Amino acid sequence: KCCQVDEKRKPVAGTEFDLRAATSLAGADFNVGFGQLANRAESAEVAWLEAANGAATVVWADPAFRWLQLFTPADFPGDEGPHRAVALEPMTVPPDALNSGTDLRWIEPGDRVEASWGVRFRAASGL
């Protein structure tokens, strides 16, 4: 569960950026950050791309990842020429955090911070 925010970090529920329900990314042109991923005590699924048959590529992340960047370029380079691509990038801070200071964590010498995220395949039921 996440909530897309505009450049002022305001929720944009009900707009074209509200992807909480199943939404086709065909023809989409996104380069946006989503927030409010913090209400988790453990690693959890934070985003997924699901095929019509229910199979999905799932992104999971530890609670340290409070943000998710969605990028859908139409001109991603490939062997057969440019094509559409989708990137789901878990992030610990939102875009422009070095200027805004939002969610920045200072790591002092000798401190250790560990966080994990990953991608897995979820088969369609019945496969």
Residue ranges and their predicted role:
Residues V46-W48, A87, E114-G118:
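Beta-strand secondary-structure signal
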Residues W48-P95:
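Glycine-rich active-site loops that engage anionic ligands at enzyme catalytic sites
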Residues K1-A64:
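Active-site/ligand-binding surface loops and adjacent short beta/alpha elements
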Residues L98, F121-L127:
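Short, Lys/Arg- and Gly-enriched loop/turn segments at beta-strand edges
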Residues G35-A38, F71-T72, E89-T92, N99, ...:
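Generic, ordered loop/turn and secondary-structure boundary motif
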Residues W106-A123:
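Short Pro-Gly-centered flexible turn/kink motifs
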Residues S43, R112-E114, L127:
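A long-range scaffold signal marking pre-active-site subdomains of enzyme folds
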